Structure formats: structure tokens, C-alpha cells
């Protein structure tokens, strides 16, 4: 479970602590530590990139084989003969493997109770048939294509620096969903008519900046996890709607301009992943 929500190193540390505590009451502590360590190592390695349910079945089989081979090897080393193998031990190994198969249910329960977001959920959110993404593609085709391109670019950058690739990919797909409210006010969705020509720079900035809070409202309605909402709120940080700010300054050269109406609410990116998105979005 730990490897699904955190990383392999954290999962291995927790597994080792658990083994040492349980070994205190184990009849054969050294054999117990060895078997549990290799089985846990196999499970962690198999589940570190969990993205499909079928991986749980593969992991269950791998855990059973690891237990069985380890037990057989220990028995041969200690007795020199397989005659003293205890058949019911293989039944215990099978039960442990079956418990691995139930991990998907536990992942769902833990996500709901503690608000964690697993890699499995991120993969599911990245499906372009998700209702929110489907609506984005229908209402804002230009924004949807932009989000796909930013997602690919950001995911590649995340891979290069060791950040959470799946989180960046999913976050990038949803970062501009607030544009669904006013698609024609964004250049990638315009087809010859620019509605900003009928607005003042302050009004235009207000409409453009609103796609951030609008996106958060839509994310809340769609029950998107907090880690995805962070990409929506932070992808512009506390930057300015630069074009409209500059336009206002040019038309009011003798006025001390208040930047607040042209400034995004933020906050600035708080993680590597949201920082990557901000840079990829600006390319």
C-alpha cells in the first residue's frame, strides 16, 4: 500500500520496520525476516508503477513464487533435503498472495478516508474520455489541444528530473478547465472574432484571470483531488495578465497603475510538479 501512495524507499523502510516488529514473536525469526523481506521487495518492485488492475494479479503470483522459492531454498540449506517441507506453508503463502489482490479495494478506501491520490487514480483521470476533459474538448478544442501538448512536454520534463510524471501529466490536462466558461475569450479558441475588442483592458483581464477560480469551481463540482486543484490554482502563480496590463499602461502613461486588477490570485507553485507546469504552459 505504501508504494502506491508514496515511493519505493518509504515503502521499503516501513516494510522493514514491520518485519522487525513481527519477528519478535515469530517462531523462527531469521527465516521469517528473510522470507518477508524478499516477498516485500518483490511486491514493492512490481507495484512501484501501478497503473492497471492486472498488475495486482501479476504481483500476487510473483509474491507467491518468491515465498515458495525462498522457503524451498531455506529448507534445503538447513536440512539438505526437501523431505521436511511443510505443505501447509505453501497454503499460507497463497493466502498472503490473495491478500495482495485485494489491495485495489484498500487503495480506494484509503483515498476516500485520508484524501490521498494513488497513481491508479491519476491514470484514470488522464483518460481523455473523462467527462470534464470531454467537455473541454467539445467546448474549447483549442484549449484541449494546448493542454495535451503541455501535458506531454511537462511529463517529459518531469521524467528528466525525477518528478512525479503521472501527477504532472494529469494536472496539465486539467489546468485550464476554467476556460470552458468563456472559451471565445482565449486566443486558441478564437476563429476570426476577438471579443476583447469590445472590452477595456481591465474587463478583459478580469475575464481571463477568472479562468482560475472558474476552474477550481469546476474541479470541486467534478470531485477532482486536491493535487489536481493545485495545478489549476498555481499554474499562473501571482503573475500578471501581461498583455492587458501593458495595454492599460500604454493608454494611461501619466497614471500610476495599480497592478492588482491584472494579477492572478495565486499562490505561486509550491512543488516541482506545479513549477514544471507553469514553465511548460509558458512555452
What name fits each language-model region?
Residues 133-283:
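Divalent metal-dependent catalytic cores for phosphoryl transfer on phosphate-bearing substrates
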Residues 1-148:
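Generic detector of multi-pass transmembrane helix bundles and their immediately adjacent loops
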Amino acid at each position: 500500500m505504501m508504494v502506491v501512495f508514496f515511493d519505493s524507499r518509504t515503502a521499503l523502510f516501513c516494510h522493514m520496520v514491520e518485519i522487525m516488529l513481527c519477528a519478535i514473536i515469530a517462531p523462527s525469526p531469521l527465516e521469517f525476516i528473510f522470507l518477508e523481506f524478499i516477498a516485500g521487495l518483490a511486491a514493492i518492485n512490481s507495484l512501484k508503477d501501478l497503473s492497471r488492475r492486472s498488475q495486482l494479479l501479476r504481483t500476487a503470483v510473483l509474491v507467491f513464487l518468491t515465498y515458495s522459492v525462498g522457503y524451498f531454498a531455506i529448507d534445503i540449506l538447513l536440512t539438505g533435503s526437501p523431505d521436511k517441507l511443510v505443505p501447509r506453508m505453501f497454503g499460507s503463502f497463497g493466502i498472503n498472495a490473495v491478500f495482495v489482490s485485494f489491495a485495489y479495494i484498500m487503495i480506494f478506501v484509503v483515498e476516500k478516508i485520508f484524501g490521498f491520490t494513488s497513481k491508479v487514480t491519476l491514470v484514470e483521470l488522464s483518460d481523455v474520455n473523462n467527462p470534464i476533459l470531454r467537455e473541454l474538448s467539445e467546448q474549447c478544442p483549442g484549449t484541449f489541444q494546448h493542454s495535451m501538448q503541455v501535458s506531454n512536454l511537462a511529463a517529459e520534463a518531469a521524467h528528466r528530473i525525477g518528478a512525479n510524471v503521472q501527477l504532472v501529466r494529469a494536472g496539465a490536462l486539467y489546468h485550464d478547465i476554467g476556460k470552458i466558461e468563456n472559451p471565445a475569450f482565449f486566443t486558441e479558441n478564437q476563429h476570426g472574432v476577438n471579443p476583447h475588442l469590445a472590452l477595456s483592458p481591465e474587463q478583459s483581464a478580469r475575464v481571463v484571470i477568472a479562468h482560475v477560480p472558474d476552474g477550481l469551481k469546476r474541479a470541486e463540482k467534478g470531485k477532482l483531488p486536491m493535487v489536481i486543484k493545485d495545478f489549476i490554482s498555481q499554474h499562473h502563480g501571482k503573475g500578471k495578465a501581461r498583455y492587458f496590463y501593458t495595454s492599460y499602461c500604454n493608454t494611461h502613461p501619466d497614471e500610476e497603475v495599480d497592478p492588482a486588477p491584472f494579477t492572478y490570485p495565486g499562490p505561486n507553485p509550491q512543488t516541482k510538479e506545479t513549477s514544471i507546469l507553469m514553465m511548460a504552459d509558458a512555452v
